[in-house]
């Protein structure tokens, strides 16, 4: 399996992601491709020191965030020579040494499965789900617009059969990474089962907006939300983030 990780200016988060991957993986079973999106900072300097990954540095002149991310994935796919390819974010953190066998088992469950993945890797409390449904019902009653996006595999965790990916236009197609690819594979008759958040969370976590925690200079409404910051800090504590960031041996 090849693991693709795009990087852009997130030193500590990139360290946490890659070190957790190293900590919970038999690296003789995977190849790790990190595509740096013209960071020109300490994060790419750090990546250059890692002998256990393959680092590709690309220029991103005129590219916005979503395009930059998707094009990085497409560049990486040109180098993939394994049967399976997993794409993750730098805020995807492994927490179990069984994650690899878990995902392989999912994608090999049937021959017509082209990929498995996640829409949102977050466990939502039942009460919050209940009130969200009430809110949606009321909005429909009042004739207000409801955002009803079609789900696809988001790139914080998406495992594909490499040959299936090559039957599409790739990750970049003027939309978020993987949107059109998911639709093309589905139209070709492939199965694309989603992994429930509650199940996937036993193997890895996706730290939504963690950049605002580890890189407090980022300016965003989310970074100024004390409740979300407290929640993320608690999650980082549960993942023993400080211990992992302090363990330089995981880079060797």
Locations of regions flagged by a protein language model:
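Glycine-rich, basic loop-to-helix element that forms the pyrophosphate-binding segment
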Residues: 60-79
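Conserved donor-nucleotide/metal-binding helix-loop-beta segment in metal-dependent transferases, i.e.
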Residues: 98-118
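C-terminal catalytic/acceptor-binding lobe
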Residues: 174-252
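A conserved acidic beta->alpha catalytic loop
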Residues: 36-45
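Short aromatic/hydrophobic "clamp" motif used to bind/position activated sugar donors
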Residues: 85
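N-proximal low-complexity "stem/linker" segments adjacent to membrane-targeting elements
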Residues: 1-20
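Short, acidic, metal-binding catalytic loop of nucleotide-sugar glycosyltransferases
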Residues: 19-29
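Short beta-strand-to-loop element that shapes/binds the nucleotide-sugar donor at the catalytic cleft/hinge
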Residues: 115-130
């Amino acid at each position: 399996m090849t693991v693709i990780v795009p990087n852009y200016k997130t030193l500590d988060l990139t360290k946490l992601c890659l070190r957790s991957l190293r900590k919970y993986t038999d690296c003789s079973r995977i190849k790790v491709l990190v595509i740096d999106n013209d960071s020109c900072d300490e994060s790419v300097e750090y990546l250059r020191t890692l002998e256990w990954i393959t680092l590709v540095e690309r220029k991103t002149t005129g590219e916005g965030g979503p395009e930059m991310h998707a094009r990085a994935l497409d560049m990486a796919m040109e180098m993939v020579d394994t049967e399976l390819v997993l794409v993750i974010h730098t805020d995807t953190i492994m927490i179990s040494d069984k994650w690899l066998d878990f995902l392989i088992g999912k994608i090999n469950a049937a021959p017509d499965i082209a990929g498995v993945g996640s829409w949102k890797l977050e466990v939502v409390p039942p009460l919050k789900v209940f009130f969200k449904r009430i809110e949606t019902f009321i909005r429909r009653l009042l004739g207000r617009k409801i955002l009803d996006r079609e789900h696809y595999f988001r790139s914080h965790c998406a495992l594909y059969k490499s040959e299936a990916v090559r039957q599409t236009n790739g990750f970049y197609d003027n939309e978020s990474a993987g949107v059109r690819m998911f639709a093309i594979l589905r139209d070709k008759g492939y199965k694309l089962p989603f992994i429930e958040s509650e199940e996937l969370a036993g193997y890895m976590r996706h730290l939504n907006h963690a950049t605002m925690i580890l890189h407090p200079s980022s300016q965003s409404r989310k970074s100024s939300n004390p409740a979300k910051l407290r929640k993320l800090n608690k999650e980082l504590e549960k993942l023993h983030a400080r211990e992992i960031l302090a363990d330089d041996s995981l880079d060797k």
